[in-house]
Amino acid sequence: VVQPNWEKTGLNIFKVYGMNSNYLSITTTTKIITENKRYDVIIVDESHKLSRRYGKQHPSFGQVYNIQGFEDCNSHLEILQKMGQQIILMYDVLQSIRPANITREMFQRLTDGYEKKFLHTQFRIQAPKGKNYTSDDYVNGIKYLLYKDTKLLSSELTNYNPNFNREVFNDKSPDAYFGYVTGKPMHQLIEWIEEDRNFNAEHINRVLSGMFCCATVDKWSIAHGKDSSITHFHEDELNRRWNSTQENWININDADAEEQIGSVFAVQGIDLNKVGVMIGPDIQVNTDGMLEAVPDSHINTNNKFSVEEMKDPDNQFEFTLYILNQYYVLLTRGIDGIRLGFWENEAFRKYMEDTLNIKK
């Protein structure tokens, strides 16, 4: 069971390895639940994105609770547990990105008694040869940067090593895995990935962005998807639009495919070679020196609680986690390297430099 944006890719991968038996299905949660068959084993990729009963989501996610036998279920995970004799779940608490996703508490309750194993290494991230730091140093550093004040790092839900090598964030050499730009973020990030593409034509490089809006970044609408004349990011004379689709985005045939700016929904579960990430004003440093999400600067309404729900401090905290998780996904897409840019958010740059002890 995979995310919709990865279904076709997953089918092709399994076919390449000859795993296209009638006894094997590559599908999505809503499809497998609607078919309502029974399976010996169900493996769920990105189970942190399994849906729960919640109003703000695509209607198809809620319609499955009308199927006979599933009326009393409160999440897709509960339904899948009824359908499979054995359930294997790939879960990352740091990648739940909207209120309709299964909550941490629901997941813990439903998997009580399950055997739990941690993934200790991010194989998608490759530190350059000859460096003293590793991919784990980078991932643990990003976790510390985003979540140090959330108490998640000390929980049993995530794997975190506080003794990461900060050299990964202080490597100033041209082949450094990590780096960041100052000044005009979109210009510089595009220039960086295009320079790499000149030397490595086979590389799949993209600029990605948090889902923010401000005076120079327009709000996105689903109606904009196929109209290449509508752009959203404006930096001097340079204009770019959001990804035109979420499904199989990196393989689309649009004339401006490589120029589109990718959102978290287009790249979750996707590996890229080199990645530029723009961090915007939807995440700010508050008066207590902690990261806090700003609802008015975030464009996707399905990522937000209602106005009434946001009066609850617990939901305010959860919303901040959703935005932090979105940036965590973006910051862990690059195999060969990443550069950060800050769109109207120099406060975050300074916060990052101080938190990770980056020497200027």
Task: Describe the role of every protein-language-model region.
Residues 43-126:
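Signature of the SF2 helicase/ATPase Hel1-core->accessory helical subdomain module
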Residues 100-103, 115-291:
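Conserved helicase/translocase motor-coupling segment
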Residues 1-12:
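Conserved Walker A/P-loop ATP-binding site and its immediately adjacent core
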Residues 100-113, 225-233, 343-360:
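C-terminal/domain-terminus segments
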Residues 83-88, 260-360:
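C-terminal accessory regions
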Residues 13-81, 259-263, 326:
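Conserved RecA-like ASCE ATPase "motif II neighborhood" in helicase/translocase motors
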Residues 39-42, 86-89, 96, 115-117, ...:
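Beta-sheet entry/capping signal
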Residues 58-75, 249-259, 298-321:
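Conserved RecA-like P-loop NTPase helicase motor core
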